Curated annotation (Swiss-Prot):
Residues 793-808 have a biased composition (Acidic residues). Residues 761-774 have a biased composition (Low complexity). This is Serine/threonine-protein phosphatase 4 regulatory subunit 3. It comes from Xenopus laevis. Belongs to the SMEK family.
Length: 822
């Protein structure tokens, strides 16, 4: 970009009319080809990413405020602001905007001329400045008409604003206000209301500075009490002077700071209460008012932060035991508002702010406050604590770990937070929900630091499970001593659901800490007691906790579940749910389906051996029958280890062979199968209801006969090879008719690639939902020495000879190798 970069903060106005911080970067201006014009560009100082790319349109109204702000509306209901670190940078960018728009840089607002016709624009530009009627009681109606007629035209709004500024007109209007009130001239007061409301819509910073000055503020509010659309006068001034009392919880020595606090409170009151709810059009015209409040708050926080005497005194009073409860409540409320204002700061300033609070001892002070009986004070302290956790959870963790070395568990800050969560008296548990979120942030390993000399995750989690976890689980353990929850009202169920949500998070993100705690304290058994709660959401929370544990596929957890028969409450809940098709039904089926699909053998065996009779009649899903099938296949492999070994050997040997050999063999299988099967004969997969090895016998038997013929041909080839000097393999396979049937049955379980019984196919023992039967007899292998076992090799005792023979076999042509995988 051509221009010098300047450091800025980018803000956007959200739907709640609050400014959102979009990041800090450097602004420049330059021609952007894609936008076909000069544009403002802001690149983030952290990574150089583009924070803002905004074309400088000739019909967009830009405003310069408070020397370091430029504000404009990018589109309807989308306002932007650039807050400059230096005035020089703001002036430079402002000049660039005015240069593009052809405006005078000495004027603090450029105008949008889009609503005016060319003729009107020429008339307005050629006419002299706007001349206001003289400020007299009899001409109030005329003044109101001039203001109202100027609002639609940007140029007329500008001229009206200049006239009001230059002639001291505002103060003369406020003098008329006093006259009208003294005379009880209601009509004149109604006209003044319209005039003052119109001046607000001029959206002019210079006018606001006059209106919100100490001399004029209350009179401006007085004018806005006489809304002609309301039958009676509003009492805003009475509220601000008599009801809303300003209390200095700590004396403020700086008069400028005190005046700024008064001003900000009253302007906020005008925006929120006094002014009528603006229309969409008027809302865009009040953007300067929002900005005025926002940047006032930033200034207040900065001034307070720099006053070390004030902050020192504040924290001294907070932690002093002699401070009475009422005074402490005022101090806490002030500190809460102070922290809320800090959210308007730029990140680097916010870092300095919270670092200052930390150095002043805000966490020990919060510990004292949380121990008080007043619920309002505790609520304010919780809000302050949430600001700290969101800003820097590591700072809070470090404090509580240091504190544990000096104090008992009962008075640890984090345990106080847990106790407040448990003891929340709100029927909706609003405070408990907030505190659960804070605890979750604190125990989340994702935001924990790991350095070369220490690991925050290990240290803090060790501390938490030793000193705090028993406090968190106390309500759960107390409520689950019997087979049903001892307390099952709605509020208790809500609290237990929050605790389970946090424990589920721990299962997912922590490792041995939570595992040891669950197994040692038998937590899962206690949690599953809640499956019998009358509140279905609590039962689902308990099931979700177990599902998270099962999903880890950890054998430590699985052995614990099996040993303690922890599927029993789940099965009971499933049966008690009956035929109702609801979330509980689906969630329970899903956990069993997960066990089947993932083939978790220990849990599969446990469920089938203990609960099959109760579940075998469930026909509307195949989940339980699939589990039974898995179990039968496991038992079959256990009862016939030779078969399992053969399957493994054949499969491993097959995987060692060249890919071209596999492709040739597969092609041979499919071609042969296609030729010999009768035309129109349907192919029945083993996953269908009617599936057994006899259905597949005929085509496979035919294939085996062809295989015998091919192998006899291979034998002749091998003999010829020997004659040419190539050494033949030490053995090769041949099949006798007596063993053909048995081997065919074996092949249906673990034989040929692409066949109905091959590994990985729907009919294999390793795949779900299949049934395969094999005879206990193993296929015979005939060698030169006669019949030997399937895995026996000649000269088995001579290991070196075996290796030599294997090497020789590997050197054979692909077509001459013994087909162990076929």
């Amino acid at each position: 970009m051509t221009d010098t970069r300047r450091r800025v903060k980018v803000y956007t106005l959200n739907e709640d009319r609050q400014w959102d911080d979009r990041g800090t970067g450097h602004v420049s201006s330059g021609y952007v080809e894609r936008l076909k014009g000069m544009s403002l560009l802001v690149r983030a100082e952290s990574d150089g990413s583009l924070l803002l790319e905004s074309k400088i349109n000739t019909n967009t109204a830009y405003q310069k405020q408070q020397d370091t702000l430029i504000v404009w509306s990018e589109a309807e209901n989308y306002d932007l602001a650039l807050s400059f670190q230096e005035k020089a940078g703001c002036d430079e960018i402002w000049e660039k905007i005015c240069q593009v728009q052809g405006k005078d840089p000495s004027v603090d607002i450029t105008q949008d001329l889009v609503d005016e016709s060319e003729e009107e624009r020429f008339d307005d530009m050629s006419s002299p400045g706007l001349e206001l009627p003289s400020c007299e009681l009899s001409r109030l109606e005329e003044i109101a008409e001039v203001v109202a007629s100027s609002l639609p035209s940007p140029l007329r709004r500008e001229k009206l604003a200049v006239a009001l500024e230059n002639e001291g007109y505002l103060k003369k209007l406020l003098e008329l206000f006093h006259v009208c009130e003294d005379l009880e001239n209601i009509e004149g007061l109604h006209h003044l209301y319209e005039v003052i409301k119109g001046i607000f819509l001029l959206n002019r910073t210079a006018l606001f500075e006059v209106m919100f000055s100490e001399d004029c503020m209350m009179d401006i509010i007085g004018c806005l009490e006489y809304d002609p659309s309301l039958p009676t006068q509003r009492k805003h001034r009475e509220f601000l002077t008599k009801t809303a009392k300003f209390k200095e919880v700590i004396p403020i020595s700086d008069p400028e700071l005190k005046q700024k606090i008064h001003q900000t409170y009253r302007v906020q009151y005008i925006q929120d209460v006094v002014l009528p709810t603006p229309s969409v059009f008027e809302e865009n015209m009040l953007s300067t008012l929002h900005s005025f409040i926002f940047f006032n708050k930033v200034e207040i926080v900065g001034m307070l932060q720099e006053d070390e005497k004030f902050l020192t005194e504040l924290f001294a009073h907070l932690t002093d035991e002699a401070t009475d409860d009422e005074k402490r409540q005022e101090l806490v409320n002030f500190l809460k508002e102070f922290c809320a204002f800090s959210q308007t700061l730029q990140p680097q300033n916010r870092d300095a702010f919270f670092k200052t609070l930390s150095n002043m001892g805000i966490l020990p002070a919060l510990e004292v406050i949380l121990g008080m009986d007043d619920p309002q004070v505790r609520s304010a302290a919780t809000d302050i604590f949430s600001y700290l956790v969101e800003y820097n959870p590591s700072m809070v963790r470090e404090f509580v770990m240091q504190e544990a070395q000096q104090n008992d568990d009962d008075i640890l800050l984090i345990n106080l937070i847990i106790e407040h969560m448990i003891c929340d008296t709100d029927p909706e548990l609003g405070g408990a929900v907030q505190l659960t979120g804070l605890l979750r942030t604190l125990v989340d390993p994702e935001n924990m630091l790991a350095t070369t000399n220490k690991t925050e995750k290990t240290e803090f989690l060790g501390f938490f499970y030793k000193h705090c976890m028993h406090v968190l689980t106390a309500p759960l353990l107390a409520n689950t001593t019997e087979e049903k929850p001892s307390k099952d009202d709605f509020q208790a169920a809500q609290l237990l659901a929050l605790i389970l949500e946090l424990l589920t998070f721990c299962v997912e993100h922590h490792t041995y800490h939570i595992k040891n705690y669950i197994i040692n304290k038998d937590i899962l058994r206690r949690v599953l007691v809640l499956m019998s709660s009358m509140h279905s959401f609590l039962g689902l929370c308990a099931l979700r906790f177990m599902r998270k544990i099962v999903g880890l596929k950890d054998e430590f957890y699985n052995r614990y579940i099996v040993k303690s028969f922890l599927f029993e409450p789940v099965v009971k809940a499933f049966l008690n749910n009956g035929s109702r098709y609801n979330l509980m039904n689906s969630a329970i089926l899903e956990i069993f389906e997960y066990i089947r699909v993932e083939d978790i053998k220990s849990l599969t065996a446990h469920v089938v051996e203990n609960y099959w009779k109760a579940l075998e009649d469930v026909e509307y899903v195949q989940t339980f029958k699939g589990l039974k099938l898995r179990y039968d296949q496991q038992r079959e492999r256990q009862d016939n280890p030779k078969l399992d070994s053969m399957r493994s050997i054949l499969r491993n040997h097959r995987y060692r062979r060249d890919a071209r050999s596999i492709e040739d063999e597969e092609e041979m299988w499919f071609n042969t199968d296609e030729d010999d099967l009768e035309d129109g004969e349907p192919v029945v997969l083993p996953s269908e209801k009617i599936k057994n090895s006899e259905d597949l016998m005929d085509p496979i038997s035919k294939f085996m006969e062809r295989k015998k013929l091919k192998e006899s041909e291979e034998k002749e080839v091998l003999l010829k090879t020997n004659l040419t000097g190539r050494q033949s393999p030490n053995f090769k396979l041949s099949f006798s008719g007596a063993t053909k049937t048995n081997l065919t049955s074996q092949l249906s379980a673990s034989g040929h690639p692409g066949s109905p019984g091959s590994p990985g196919s729907p009919g294999s023992p390793e795949s779900p939902g299949s049934v395969s039967k094999s005879t206990p007899q193993a296929a015979a292998i005939t060698t030169k020495g006669g019949l030997i076992g399937l895995v026996d090799y000649p000269d088995d005792d001579e290991e070196d000879d075996d290796n030599d023979e294997e090497e020789k076999e590997e050197r054979l042509p692909l077509t001459k190798k013994a087909r162990l995988g076929s």
